């Protein structure tokens, strides 16, 4: 399920094109307050997958019934959403009620959400495969310290939004600062571009 609220439909459209190219089944639900406020209507009508688009217009009384939409869930289904925070929260709540497991509920962001005033501390990364240790200063990200040590890690957004730099966590207490991992994912992984040891001078052993 692809759930787009307002301009948040933009990344959902990109995902729909990709899913169609892969021959995967999907449905795209687009919620807007009015047709005048809706973008992409002509593009969606002409898309080769236009029969999978469901438009919900509040001003016309066709506001999305999120619980009814989520009722179509089958094992293995995933739900992705992007839009105003209130909309995404409602979608995630409905998905949870419908039984979507946490790892099957995904939030997409246009920009970095608000976050606490974090305090950076130096810490150490221990690479499980070699036993090598890499020091991370308070002024740099783990990915920067690894790069300086000659260890390449793929990075895309550098904001903890995309998950490209996800790495397995072997041991250590992590201050997770990403916006992509579920609670279950955080038990076994971390996002290297953002997350740090939870305590000053802590040691994180990672699967590198």
Model-derived features: positions:
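Local cysteine-cluster metal-coordination motifs and their immediate loop/turn environment
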Residues: 11, 147, 151-175, 186-199
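Active-site donor-binding loop signature of nucleotide-sugar glycosyltransferases
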Residues: 58, 195, 208
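Short, charged low-complexity linear segments at domain edges
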Residues: 124-149, 166-175
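A short, sequence-level motif marking secondary-structure junctions
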Residues: 137-143, 180-183, 196-198
């Amino acid at each position: 399920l692809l759930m787009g609220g307002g301009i948040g439909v933009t990344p959902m459209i990109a995902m729909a094109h990709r899913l169609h190219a892969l021959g995967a089944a999907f449905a795209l639900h687009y919620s807007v307050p009015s047709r005048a406020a809706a973008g992409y209507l002509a593009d969606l009508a002409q898309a080769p997958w236009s029969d999978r688009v469901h438009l919900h217009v509040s001003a016309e009384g066709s506001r999305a019934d999120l619980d009814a939409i989520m009722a179509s869930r089958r094992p293995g289904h995933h739900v992705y959403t992007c839009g105003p925070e209130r909309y995404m929260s409602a979608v995630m709540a409905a998905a949870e009620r419908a039984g979507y497991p946490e790892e099957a509920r995904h939030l997409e962001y246009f920009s970095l959400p608000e976050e606490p005033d974090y305090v950076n501390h130096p810490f150490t990364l221990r690479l499980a495969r070699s036993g090598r240790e890499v020091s991370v200063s308070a002024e740099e990200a783990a990915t920067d310290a690894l790069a300086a040590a000659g260890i390449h890690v793929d990075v895309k957004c550098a904001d903890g939004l995309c998950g490209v730099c996800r790495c397995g966590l072997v041991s250590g207490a992590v201050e997770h600062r990403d916006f992509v991992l579920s609670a279950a994912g955080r038990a076994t992984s971390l996002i290297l571009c953002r997350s740090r040891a939870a305590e000053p001078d802590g040691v994180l052993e990672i699967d590198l």
